[in-house]
């Protein structure tokens, strides 16, 4: 079969489109996988600080089971201007089974992570903070650990004295969040519907339990994603094992399955699916093969013409 220049060009375009479509859903700049950092102790898409310790094989420890620590990680680039979904694998644990604290937080805020008193993050932030608070300081009659959501306006401080009671716009109990196994947190932001949903699958389970749904949610024009944690007089370790983010569309909302928990459970995203670089390499190799076939066929046709000319 002869490959015309037009056919090869169309095949090349088709291959490029397929490669692009395969990558559009995955947000590499908002995802994190082992080994997390390069040999220069840096990550292209994330920055970290405070007490954060990165174990290239075992995870990112925002704090260890040590008193008076605070650590954070934050994206270098903002979240997309469209709808998106985040699935993150985390663990909260300590040697003590009775006294432990203080908690881990997930932020979608205009500020990148800076050291501060709100679970290791700066106070008076602009955006949304989701706090997994593991110790009840001044909330009698309220079960802890607990997930508490705060909408920051850039001016209002966090209500330290009452574990965020004055700031709380939604919450749910998270009694099973502490333990030896990993939890999965899933956040889904629907920009068109202005909705924000958060779910948790506890202790190795892949069955998500809805924590809250928020309506009329508008993120800051420029929004960064951050995780932070802190310990005080009590302590526990706060670990992030992996983060997977992707864009979502109206079609996804109606029929496309969400990110399956199995993609993170017991492994990291990078061990399950290739990165953009791998996809690009595969695409380039495919194009090379196509053009090699075209060149070979063109050479054969030219040789046949030369042979006929010689015979004549």
From Swiss-Prot:
GO BP terms in the entry: endoplasmic reticulum to Golgi vesicle-mediated transport
Compartments in which it is found: Membrane; Endoplasmic reticulum; Golgi apparatus; Vacuole
Residues annotated as transmembrane: 281-301
UniProt keyword Electron transport, yes or no: no
Xref: PANTHER family: RE50040P (PTHR12223:SF45), VESICULAR MANNOSE-BINDING LECTIN (PTHR12223)
Signal peptide: 1-22
Cytoplasmic topological segments: 302-312
Keyword entries, A-Z: Endoplasmic reticulum, Golgi apparatus, Membrane, Signal, Transmembrane, Transmembrane helix, Vacuole
GO cellular component term of the entry, any: Golgi apparatus
Protein name as annotated: L-type lectin-like domain-containing protein C126.08c
GO function terms (MF aspect): D-mannose binding
UniProt main location, coarse: membrane
Domain annotation L-type lectin-like: ranges: 24-248
Topology class, membrane: Single-pass type I membrane protein
UniProt keyword annotation of Signal present: yes
Membrane topology (Extracellular): 23-280
